[in-house]
Amino acid sequence: MPAAFPVTAATPAGAEALDRLRHWPGEHRVAVGLSGGVDSSLTAALLVEAGWEVEGLTLWLMSGKGACCAEGLVDAAGICEQLEIPHHVVDSRDTFQREIVNGLIEGYQAGITPLPCSRCNRAVKFSPMLQWAQEKRGLARIATGHYARLRFDETTGRWRLLRGLDARKDQSYFLYDLTQEVLARVVFPLGELTKPDTRLEAARHGLRTAAKPESQDLCLADHHGSMRAFLDAYLPPRQGEIVLQDGTVVGEHDGIEHFTIGQRKGLGVAWSEPLHVVRLDAAMNRVVVATRDQAGRSHCVVGAINWVSMAPPAPEHSQMVQVQVRYRSAPVPARLTTMTAEASDAAAERPHRCRLDFDEPQFSITPGQAAVFYDGDAVLGGGLIQTSA
């Protein structure tokens, strides 16, 4: 235990977290993904206090300033020094550029609104960190500061991914793409804590990051100052028309990448009633808008599904679920019906598709975003929205 470790008693939430970690099944040796923020810092501190053998692992994702850049590396190194644990840095900038930045730009150019965070978790963070920890340090587990919970279901033999206790900070939406193989080797120490609990516990440990401001949800926006600034750095302005669904021109834009489905504000269009973006036409470089009574969507098709808390169902399986179609949106009821994979999808890594029929029209069904299916707090699965109508 580090000499500078706190002697004051843990908060009730902190004490419960420590008890869970002390009784966690299996080996208590772990690499902690450290971004340099308060959440990952406390994750490492709690594991050390619970008696785990802990090593810090930071992925260097971008050059410049920010949580995933040099600033984050410095704070992460400082935390490891304070906790008296080893700190390792893996240069993942090329992988991040290839898997996330390039894919994001290509998506916006194609007229979709990509969700980089879930792909980053799967392709850049969790699986690569597990591989590095196992191969380089002989560590079978990783831990992160995500607000989500895990439970093993003895009946199904599957790990169930659950919402974090703090509804405002719950990050299960971004974790739907993690496989059972990954979930079996992951620990989420903050899953039962609220953000205020985290701040209090970080202060109790005297962590240098205890009062550090939160970064934006999207690290690229945080890195560039805004999402628009990020897009402007990669995509030159390309003027086009804003049109009604019948083709009537009602305005102009300087790039479809600056718009998303459901958007009402910032269109720069004067009309007799509010207009909403309903489609981005990349081929014609057009933003298609409609009044609210025309903007609702009753169903959508979801592809590249990853089944989490439930095994992949048979084609034409149907059940009611709660669906979340944006990170900050509330879940809504819908009927999920699985579909037979198309010939073009048959060889894909994740060929599963489904149709979602909503109880009431939805106004933010956005191709490229994730639709995540819930049963209560449990993530049943999720995939990427392909089409809507």
UniProtKB/Swiss-Prot annotation:
It is found in: Cytoplasm. The active site is at 120 (nucleophile), 219 (cysteine persulfide intermediate). InterPro entries: MnmA-like, MnmA-like_C, MnmA-like_central, MnmA-like_central_sf, Rossmann-like_a/b/a_fold. ATP binds at residues 33-40, 59, 145. The keyword rRNA-binding does not apply. The keyword Nucleotide-binding applies. Disulfide bonds join 120-219. Pfam families: tRNA_Me_trans, tRNA_Me_trans_C, tRNA_Me_trans_M. It catalyses: S-sulfanyl-L-cysteinyl-[protein] + uridine(34) in tRNA + AH2 + ATP = 2-thiouridine(34) in tRNA + L-cysteinyl-[protein] + A + AMP + diphosphate + H(+). CDD domains: MnmA_TRMU-like (cd01998). It is an enzyme of class 2 (transferase). Keywords: ATP-binding, Cytoplasm, Disulfide bond, Nucleotide-binding, RNA-binding, Transferase, tRNA processing, tRNA-binding. One of its GO terms (cellular component) is cytoplasm. GO terms for molecular function: ATP binding; tRNA binding; tRNA-uridine 2-sulfurtransferase activity. Residues 169-171, 326-327 are annotated as: Interaction with tRNA. The record marks 146, 369 as: Interaction with tRNA. GO terms for biological process: tRNA wobble position uridine thiolation. Its EC number is 2.8.1.13. Its main location: cytoplasm. Catalyzes the 2-thiolation of uridine at the wobble position (U34) of tRNA, leading to the formation of s(2)U34. Belongs to the MnmA/TRMU family. This is tRNA-specific 2-thiouridylase MnmA. It comes from Synechococcus sp. (strain WH7803). The gene is mnmA.
